Amino acid sequence: MTNIRKTHPLTKIINHSFIDLPTPSNISSWWNFGSLLGLCLVIQIMTGLFLAMHYTPDTTTAFSSVTHICRDVNYGWMIRYLHANGASMFFMCLFIHIGRGIYYGSFTFLETWNIGIMLLFTVMATAFMGYVLPWGQMSFWGATVITNLLSAIPYIGTNLVEWIWGGFSVDKATLTRFFAFHFILPFIITALTAIHLLFLHESGSNNPSGMTSDSDKIPFHPYYTLKDILGVIALLITLSTLVLFSPDLLGDPDNYTPANPLNTPPHIKPEWYFLFAYAILRSIPNKLGGVLALISSILILALMPFLNMAKQRSMMFRPLSQCLFWTLVANLMVLTWIGGQPVENPFIIIGQLASIMYFSTILIFMPLTNLLENKLLKW
């Protein structure tokens, strides 16, 4: 009798993706973050669904409804903070996942990499719209500032901004449509994730050595299911600690003040996971230039497969590239810090230098280092 797991049309898909999937035997814990991102997505959809049951997308009651969730709904405070801090964990895993892809040369899987970039943009859009929903001061002014950036587009900019706002300022129409998009986008993310996995399983996973591992594969279950569970436990402990002990650690105190169009906060800043891009945006004095730099800071990832000159796929055996990679990581941390600082010296010049360093590392130094390493290895 044949195993139903291998023959039934539904279980066959699950079997080929998560059970009998041939996986390289040497992949490290850096490969855990894909499954952790899946877990984060599930947590966000579930907590988001329960929040949507009590939330009202109306400018007069949105702030009160979030307060009502925290005070009157059973474990509403926990659901709300799981959702808010779950987004932070999502981005933490996302950044590590992308970093691993760069370090071990996974960007050579073109389709998987490009769908990953689309996923990054979609997740960023979802998080931005979610931040607007509590309708606090930072929600309102964040929405105003970021949507206003589109007015830098020549000819159609102003019309485009008013079209997105649904009026002449951020108001009820904006909040309602942001709620609608924030609700639908996670399901689009889920669909894109399925396509991401589909393309990944066409080529098979990369591994730390960067070499083909066809001769040395093991089944995903039980080896990597067990290994992933360890990551899941670590993630849940971190998230629970954050939610139960310091739920507002990563938030902004200004968002506990109801939105007031007549009072601008002294310092408008997004959540921590957008600060690096916000710092790049602010480092250019020109509005259109800043917007282009902001988009380029993410889109530059799409150029990585074409800028790669190395004969070895992984950075595992390339110490010069490793130094450059960790310099890039440190640079992104500096940008994140600068994004949260006021626009004054010395922060302005540090932000500008860090932005130049970010783009030149990826566009100039990395390809040159690749060529130098090829030369040193007589390739």
From Swiss-Prot:
InterPro entries documented for this protein: Cyt_b/b6_C, Cyt_b/b6_C_sf, Cyt_b/b6_N, Cytb/b6-like_sf, Cytochrome_b, Cytochrome_b_C_euk/bac, Cytochrome_b_N_euk/bac, Di-haem_cyt_TM
Primary location class: mitochondrion
Residues spanning the membrane: 33-53, 77-98, 113-133, 178-198, 226-246, 288-308, 320-340, 347-367
Protein's recorded name: Cytochrome b
GO cellular component, one term: respiratory chain complex III
Subunit (UniProt): The cytochrome bc1 complex contains 11 subunits: 3 respiratory subunits (MT-CYB, CYC1 and UQCRFS1), 2 core proteins (UQCRC1 and UQCRC2) and 6 low-molecular weight proteins (UQCRH/QCR6, UQCRB/QCR7, UQCRQ/QCR8, UQCR10/QCR9, UQCR11/QCR10 and a cleavage product of UQCRFS1). This cytochrome bc1 complex then forms a dimer.
Names of required cofactors: heme b
Record-annotated disulphide pairs: none
Highest taxon, organism lineage: Eukaryota
Gene Ontology molecular function terms on file: metal ion binding; ubiquinol-cytochrome-c reductase activity
Organism of derivation: Loris tardigradus
Cofactor, how bound (note): Binds 2 heme b groups non-covalently.
Keyword set includes Transmembrane: yes
BP terms from Gene Ontology: mitochondrial electron transport, ubiquinol to cytochrome c
Subcellular location: Mitochondrion inner membrane
Gene giving rise to this polypeptide: MT-CYB
